[in-house]
Amino acid sequence: IGFASEAVGRVIPTHSTGSLMLDLVCGSGDRAGFPEGRILEIYGPESAGKTTVCLLAIAARQQEEDQKELADPTYNKKLCIYLDAEHALDLRIAEEYGVNLNELILIDPVTSEDALDVVDELIRSGQIAIMVVDSVPALIPSSVEKASYNQQFMAVLARFMSNVMQKIIGPAHTNGTTIIFINQIREKPGAWSPTG
């Protein structure tokens, strides 16, 4: 606890998004790109390029980690996680965007709770640079799987996401893990689509 004036000089490290234009939109100079240790949400309509932005950010961060390791052979480089809740990631496309699949942890969850327990442990290890969650509507808690989709799906998902945020926001900040949630814009708030 302290006065905000004491923290004025504090700089939040940023990392390239993999796109110069997006870096500049997110900041300027040495503050361009996605902030380290923060939670971000990329949202938009289906096929708007949300996954592409995330794959480019992963590729850029992997290259940055490679450069750090080249400069200092004792450096323990961080990895990236792609939590594919939609079960739709095309790994060939990821590779075309420059993602090193040998250094990408892919989580293809059966239930969201199981996946997020693993993710929480990995983030707390301090060895994760970026985690992408694709996508928020596909994070189906087991309580929803067992129930009818008519039983207030959106309310259950909102409570689940609130619990997720409470669990990961502190460790992500402490360990410098950038977490990117992909979300979609819907015309009908109850509708769900496994793409986007």
Residue ranges and their predicted role:
Residues 127-145:
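Conserved P-loop NTPase "ATPase switch" module shared by AAA+ and STAND
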Residues 84-86, 135-136, 181-186:
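A short beta-strand-to-loop transition that corresponds to the Sensor-1 phosphate-sensing loop
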Residues 102-112, 144-160, 192-196:
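Flexible beta-alpha connector loops of hexameric P-loop NTPases
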Residues 77-79, 127-130, 174-181:
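Loop/turn-to-beta-strand initiation segments
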Residues 1-107, 120-124:
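The Walker A/P-loop phosphate-binding site
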Residues 115-131, 168:
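Short amphipathic alpha-helices and their capping/turn segments at secondary-structure boundaries
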Residues 15-19, 36, 51-55, 109-117, ...:
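Amphipathic alpha-helical transducer elements in NTP-driven molecular machines
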Residues 122, 154-196:
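Phosphate-binding/switch region of NTP-binding enzymes
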